[in-house]
Amino acid sequence: MIDLKQYEFWFLVGSQYLYGLETLKKVEQQASRIVEALNNDPIFPSKIVLKPVLKNSAEIREIFEKANAEPKCAGVIVWMHTFSPSKMWIRGLSINKKPLLHLHTQYNREIPWDTIDMDYMNLNQSAHGDREHGFIHARMRLPRKVVVGHWEDREVREKIAKWMRVACAIQDGRTGQIVRFGDNMREVASTEGDKVEAQIKLGWSINTWGVGELAERVKAVPENEVEELLKEYKERYIMPEDEYSLKAIREQAKMEIALREFLKEKNAIAFTTTFEDLHDLPQLPGLAVQRLMEEGYGFGAEGDWKAAGLVRALKVMGAGLPGGTSFMEDYTYHLTPGNELVLGAHMLEVCPTIAKEKPRIEVHPLSIGGKADPARLVFDGQEGPAVNASIVDMGNRFRLVVNRVLSVPIERKMPKLPTARVLWKPLPDFKRATTAWILAGGSHHTAFSTAVDVEYLIDWAEALEIEYLVIDENLDLENFKKELRWNELYWGLLKR
């Protein structure tokens, strides 16, 4: 479902007519070699497209107009090969709507000590050309990613590739829809939010459909489609054979087919359900939701559209990378002194992309929702570095809270726990990380990912100009409290 190859990134090189046609030709040739080399590196998720060298204000404005109008263009990379006076860039930058990366590099890695002359100096001016360009970005208060270093360096390429994945997630969020089946869980605060502001700031279009419409589609699913899907279940998962379980699994298969059809029809990228509004659905969607998350859809339980959108964004960022991303909830604690851990799970809806083993389909009673026993995938989660991220509405802004965690082995079996689960240690440690999370107002619902790291989320927040707070091994609680106070002032004063 997620194809980052559909996007492209425009590579804009700045110069001016001052240096003459011969120098401009060399600028174009060297830029072409850089872009060709980058496109030959599989680390980049999308194609980088070189545009003609930009030499005056009219050309610059025109290229940004075209970038804005091109849905395939997910972002713009700028580099000043020579000195390119930045007043020329104001009209173009002022209309830019795409994520922006400022690459501060140079074609040659080393100074040619024995042959360097003024022709070389006039050609290779990014050392001061990019400083001029950096000033106009700062003066215009533009959100941008700055990457510094030689274009052949692995670290430089990794940072560009991460940013490209983030930009793809932003473009995806601006063109798709989040479908809500029913409303938020009654009386819950953190899952609420301003859907109008979400579309303005994040690009997410969030709309609600009645569960009854979905229920009618479930009833109309052809039996032959159900049989085909059951064959796939048997191939991919450990599946029970008893009649009680198979009946429940068939109902989830029907819901999966109906949900997928509905989501495709609405051009949806994510969706929510709530156990308080199931209408004529036979079960709370469990296996069906897990399967759709596995395809790449974002999901949020209990109407949590912010979690659904964030899960989708991380899935786009991590598409094709090792690991996975899931809707998650901090469920219960293991509080042995010195080894405090969090058990993350949800009633049914944990994505199998984070499974460390072949998932099992199980059917068990569910005490809420008032429906038949639902089928779900059960598994232990992957081990290793991960992130937990939550987006909350603070009234005058969105706040992204991110915690680096270490997922650890589940050393004891839990034979009576009928849900997928993952066990992690928050960094820097349980007490400080949890204190900071609670002080920041982070939700109990999160996007949990073993595919992306904190840098992706920082790039995402900065590109969208929303507040972010990072809780990691460098946390100082007193400074964190100060950051919360400073942010209140900053975001209160900021008017854009």
Curated annotation (Swiss-Prot):
Q: Name one Pfam family in it.
A: AraA_central
Q: GO molecular function: any one?
A: L-arabinose isomerase activity
Q: Which GO terms describe its cellular component?
A: cytosol
Which SUPFAM superfamilies does this chain map to? FucI/AraA C-terminal domain-like, FucI/AraA N-terminal and middle domains
Per UniProt, where does Mn(2+) bind? E302, E329, H346, H445
Source organism, top-level taxon: Bacteria
Say which family it is in.
Belongs to the arabinose isomerase family.
| Role, per record | Catalyzes the conversion of L-arabinose to L-ribulose.
Its protein name is: L-arabinose isomerase
Source species:
Thermotoga neapolitana (strain ATCC 49049 / DSM 4359 / NBRC 107923 / NS-E)
What lineage is this protein's organism placed in? Bacteria, Thermotogati, Thermotogota, Thermotogae, Thermotogales
